[in-house]
Amino acid sequence: MFDSLGRTLRRAGYATLAFDYSGHGASGDEIITFDPLIEDFRSASGWLADQGFARQICVGHEFGAAVALRSRPPAAQTYVLVSPVLGPLSYDWNLVFSDVQLSDLEHHGATTVPDDSESVRQQFTISKRTLADMSMVSGEDALRGLSVPVLITHDSFDEETGLLDRTREIFHLLPDGSLVEMTAAPDGIAGEYTPVDGVPVIDEAVDRALAASGSAHLPVLTDVAAEWVSRWVPVSR
């Protein structure tokens, strides 16, 4: 998602930055909780501003959306939030973690999780605090005092996992000019789709989501995002 969106924005004349949070990718082995991630986001934004990029578009995906909003960098002109988690969700951690990992969390307060992404990292570390941060996201706290417009995009899978419902609940808190847009499910997602960790989605629900996306003739994320940023943060020539 970030790669394709980044390519689209660069073609439109924007400079982009992607970075590894603490505990992710090539960064240090920190326990992953929201507070350090928020500081990382602020630091990255501040560094960009120091390089002369004082008009910024902040992009966040799922839990990263809450991190981006709570970071509240001064240079942010707008936010693009893709399938954001903007409210509490119920998780069955038994579907996510092994018995050994659950025992480690119970007795030691932390455990390691294999990183099956394309990252150079082999594993990352989480704690009980991580689970609390993921379970108890507050959309009200994330949006309180926000004054710049926000684009929120959801696809049909978000209806099955409850993410769309969380956005509906906080819609009245969005700043003036904000937009919630439904977009098409990404190509090839049927074979590789995994829901937000711990939120069970049965095969029938995946079929429903794909059918809904295919029949609605929805726009693709990159087109929606490109139109949005050109409106609120036009490229300086």
Give each language-model segment a name:
Residues 51-62:
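Alpha/beta-hydrolase fold nucleophile elbow
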